[in-house]
C-alpha cells in the first residue's frame, strides 16, 4: 500500500531543541542574576534534562516536577546556590521564552515543501502542549501540517502505543498507510514499528548504536531517497 501519511516528531527532529534551549538560557540566566558560564551550565543540564524527560515519558515524574527538578539538580551539581523562588521563576520563563528562538535543522523547509506535495503531514510530540504550536508558528512550519497530536491531549506519552493508535484514528489512517520520522529510537521508532507503522530514524549526530533493522538518516533531505 502506498504511503499517504507522514508523521514527524518535533523537538530534535525538525525543531533544533538544543540550539534553541541554549539561546533561551543565555537570555534568562543573566536576567535572574545567575552568574555562570553557559557552556558549563549546559554540560551538566543537558544529561539531567534528558534523564528527566525519560522519567516523564515513563510516567515517573510529573510535568511540574520535571520543570523544577532539572534546574534544581543542575544548580546543585554545579554548587550554585539559587533560591527555590528563582528556580520556579526560571522554569516558567524558560517555557515562555523558548518558542521565541526558532532554529530548525538543515533542510527542514525544503523537505516539508517536497513532502507536502505528495503526502498528508502530521506531528506527534511529547512536548508541552502550551508551547509546541507556538514553536511551529514562530518557526514558520505550522502550515505544513494537517494535524498536531500532543501526548498531553492523548493522556499518555510516547512510547505508549496508545499515542499512535490515537493518531491513526485522528487522521483516519491505517498503519500501513503511514510512516514515522523521529530522533528517539524508543519513543518514535520502535513503538511505531511495533504498531505496524513504517519508521525512519533521524540521526544527525551519527550515533553508532542503531539496530541494523532500523533505517537511519543523518540529514532530513535524505528522506527524498525513501519518500
Task: List the predicted regions and their residue ranges.
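Catalytic-core regions built around general acid/base machinery
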Residues: 107-118
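Generic recognition of short, well-ordered alpha-helical interface segments
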Residues: 66-70, 103, 110, 162, ...
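Glycine-centered short loops/turns at secondary-structure junctions
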Residues: 118-119, 196
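Asp-based, Mg2+/Mn2+-dependent phosphohydrolase catalytic module
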Residues: 1-6, 19, 85, 113, ...
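N-terminal helical cap/lid subdomain that shapes the substrate entry/recognition surface
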Residues: 2-10, 14-105
